[in-house]
């Protein structure tokens, strides 16, 4: 048996739902999708859900992962085994841990490939900081996986599909975190995993002010702006949501233009699936040139304005 009888899907990030649903179609005979509202439920059916389970009644001061109890109860009531697919977001991983405990299931994070043999999931994901690919065969009846972005192609909606909708009522967990206040986060983040063209800056750009040069190039060619982890986490020059690497974004654009990025393996794991990699770096021995299809050795502060001017003609 090369499929599960049932798969259960949930995404706290709507943009990740299409790829999870496409993976579900390949891995199971029946697809169940947990959603938070009617609009997401209708979309899930178009993506192939046989059953939609709308999570309802959570107080505004509680977290989404507090639905784990009723989700696990629903899963157990409809089969003695099954596969759970979640995005590898922070909230997805929190929910995976809670579901794994309640279902007595093995949990595997950041899956980059999933297959089913004899009713058991085999999962591949990066290990040793991206230096190798590990493979796990999950022996527990239930398997809970968080899926890396780009593991599956996005499912295409089909308005002719039909499915059944059910309601799952909130049940307060015995122990929970209560939100007492919220603060809006200033962020201009985009869905970088959907971008065709990406310009990504590293500390070699020199300063936060010089990032404007990369932004101008983005406008000229219609690209999205990303960065390396040190730019976001250490220097605080850009938002966390924009950094590319093994612990965050895994991109597959048509073009990845790396500006002032050294090319350490932890970063390149998130970029080396790009169709074309173009590197700009002052250091001719930078590791990035081992991955690049094209490269320029030189000062990005001088090269970026020249590229922008050339594309603007």
From Swiss-Prot:
FAD binds at residues 255-283. GO terms for biological process: carnitine metabolic process; fatty acid beta-oxidation using acyl-CoA dehydrogenase. One of its GO terms (molecular function) is electron transfer activity. InterPro entries: DHS-like_NAD/FAD-binding_dom (IPR029035), ETF_a/b_N (IPR014730), ETF_a/FixB (IPR001308), ETF_asu_C (IPR014731), ETF_asu_C_CS (IPR018206), FixB (IPR023461), Rossmann-like_a/b/a_fold (IPR014729). Gene3D superfamilies: HUPs, TPP-binding domain. Keywords: Electron transport, FAD, Flavoprotein, Transport. It comes from the Bacteria. Pathway: Amine and polyamine metabolism; carnitine metabolism. It holds the Pfam family ETF. Heterodimer of FixA and FixB. HAMAP family: FixB. Required for anaerobic carnitine reduction. May bring reductant to CaiA. Belongs to the ETF alpha-subunit/FixB family. This is Protein FixB.
